[in-house]
């Protein structure tokens, strides 16, 4: 971004991938207004998220109705909608498009039988998924890596098998090769003495916005869990952050 800061420039793309923004940027070059280009981007992300979720859940369940239900549940998740329509967290809701592909990759890993080779055609989805996370929202990428670590510990007997480890190592290798052009400058800048590496005190914010386990399945909003930024912000007063009771019913039925 050479035009930022009165012509001094600011390399924001090094720390925050913007590959997904080429679509609205192209619309802008074609004469579409900024507002309409952004609306088109949101529409594309919503359609893409629904389609990717449907594909992943169809591969997992093998049933079209189950896949459609899972896609609706994921696409209409309160937090995802809040990221779009309340917080305008573009990087975050863009990254959510790729998360079902990560889930699918570990489904492939877990269902593989002992010494059964996991075919090459099952590499595309996870590589695209991890690449999408890296290129859209690095924080989501780190959070996903943390959850994968916990997942691998829980299912260590099924993960630490020769065929599964070979499959996962190929995913890691291909993902790194595809994203080295982004990862190397990112790590170089992280090693510099910039403000982005400084420690910030987040305790009050965590206590204000955090949710305990019981609140994760709340149906209605309260003063802690919603995105209320003013008395007149009516939509944010009605946007809860928990996963909702629908997910609780799904888990109970499972």
Residue positions per predicted region:
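Active-site lumenal/periplasmic loops and adjacent helix-entry segments of GT-C-fold
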Residues: 1-98, 105, 132, 136-139
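Periplasmic/ER-lumenal interhelical loops and adjacent helix-loop junctions
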Residues: 167, 172-254
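Structural signal for the C-terminal ends of transmembrane alpha-helices
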Residues: 105-114, 150-160, 254
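Generic alpha-helical transmembrane segments of integral inner-membrane proteins
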Residues: 44-48, 72, 97, 101, ...
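Membrane-interface transmembrane helices that cradle and orient dolichyl/undecaprenyl
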Residues: 100-124
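Perimembrane helix-loop-helix junctions
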Residues: 143-176, 186
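Membrane-interface alpha helices of multi-pass inner-membrane proteins
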Residues: 122-137, 171-177
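Membrane-interface helix-loop-helix junctions at transmembrane boundaries of multi-pass membrane enzymes
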Residues: 65, 116-118, 157-168, 254
């Amino acid at each position: 971004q050479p035009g930022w800061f009165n012509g001094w420039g600011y390399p924001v793309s090094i720390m925050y991938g913007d590959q997904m923004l080429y679509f609205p940027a192209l619309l802008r070059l074609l004469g579409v207004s900024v507002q309409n280009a952004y609306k088109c981007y949101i529409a594309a992300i919503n359609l893409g998220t629904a389609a990717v979720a449907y594909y992943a859940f169809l591969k997992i369940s093998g049933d079209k109705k189950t896949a459609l239900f899972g896609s609706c549940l994921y696409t209409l998740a309160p937090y995802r909608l809040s990221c779009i329509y309340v917080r305008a967290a573009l990087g975050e809701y863009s990254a959510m498009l790729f998360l079902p592909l990560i889930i699918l990759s570990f489904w492939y890993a877990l269902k593989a039988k002992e010494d059964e080779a996991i075919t090459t055609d099952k590499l595309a989805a996870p590589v695209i998924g991890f690449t999408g996370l890296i290129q859209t929202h690095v924080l989501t990428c780190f959070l996903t890596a943390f959850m994968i670590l916990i997942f691998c510990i829980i299912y260590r007997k099924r993960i630490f098998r020769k065929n599964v480890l070979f499959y996962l190592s190929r995913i890691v290798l291909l993902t790194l090769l595809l994203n080295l052009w982004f990862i190397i400058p990112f790590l170089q800048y992280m090693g510099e003495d910039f403000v982005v590496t400084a420690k910030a005190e987040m305790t009050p914010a965590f206590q204000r916005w955090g949710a305990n386990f019981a609140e994760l399945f709340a149906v209605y909003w309260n003063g802690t869990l919603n995105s209320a930024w003013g008395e007149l912000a009516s939509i944010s007063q009605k946007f809860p952050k928990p996963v909702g009771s629908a997910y609780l019913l799904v888990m109970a039925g499972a």
